[in-house]
């Protein structure tokens, strides 16, 4: 299972998409949720998707990043505690520094945000057999095993197929909502 998001700062909201996929990457179902850009509701959006899609046979929840949509975040540990399924957060580019500095400047609730971001812990670097570097945070599963799981369902490149598909449909859903002209009225 995989959850990814798509946003533009001007939208004010991020569209989260989740897909339930088999180990071979074949997608069986999808669900959507919204979160505020720069908000604190990323974990809630991911939780709504899990409530819609999770089954007993799901063995891993893959997240496309933990710090998302302009310093919103998804708390993998909270998802693991609530749903009793291993959760792994993947970042496919080297994480940019100075997150704390930016959060202090941008948000009045910066202390809460920094605490939540620190709670995520540092990522573990995983090197794929094809030479790609993936940064992984994991709960309920060893980060190396989470890296192997990602590699198993990666057809080409470095992004696992379920995350790639979730990212594509999140972007398509965001564009669709904008086309409807109702995007601003959803909240």
From Swiss-Prot:
PANTHER family: UPF0215 PROTEIN MJ1150. Belongs to the UPF0215 family. It comes from Pyrobaculum aerophilum (strain ATCC 51768 / DSM 7523 / JCM 9630 / CIP 104966 / NBRC 100827 / IM2). InterPro entries: Endo_dU (IPR002802). This is UPF0215 protein PAE0952. Pfam families: DUF99.
């Amino acid at each position: 299972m995989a959850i990814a998001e798509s946003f533009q700062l001007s939208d004010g909201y991020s569209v989260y998409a989740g897909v339930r996929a088999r180990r071979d990457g074949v997608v069986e179902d999808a669900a959507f949720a919204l979160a505020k850009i720069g908000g604190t509701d990323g974990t809630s959006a991911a939780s709504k998707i899990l409530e819609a899609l999770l089954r007993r046979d799901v063995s891993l929840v893959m997240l496309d990043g933990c710090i998302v949509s302009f310093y919103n975040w998804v708390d993998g540990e909270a998802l693991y505690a609530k749903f009793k399924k291993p959760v792994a957060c993947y970042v496919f580019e080297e994480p940019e520094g100075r997150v704390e500095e930016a959060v202090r400047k941008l948000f009045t609730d910066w202390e809460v945000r920094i605490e939540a971001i620190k709670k995520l812990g540092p990522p573990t670097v995983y090197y794929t057999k094809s030479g790609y570097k993936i940064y992984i945070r994991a709960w309920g599963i060893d980060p190396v095993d989470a890296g192997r799981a990602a590699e198993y369902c990666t057809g080409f490149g470095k992004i696992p197929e379920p995350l790639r598909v979730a990212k594509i449909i999140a972007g398509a859903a965001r564009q669709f909502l904008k086309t409807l002209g109702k995007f601003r009225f959803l909240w």
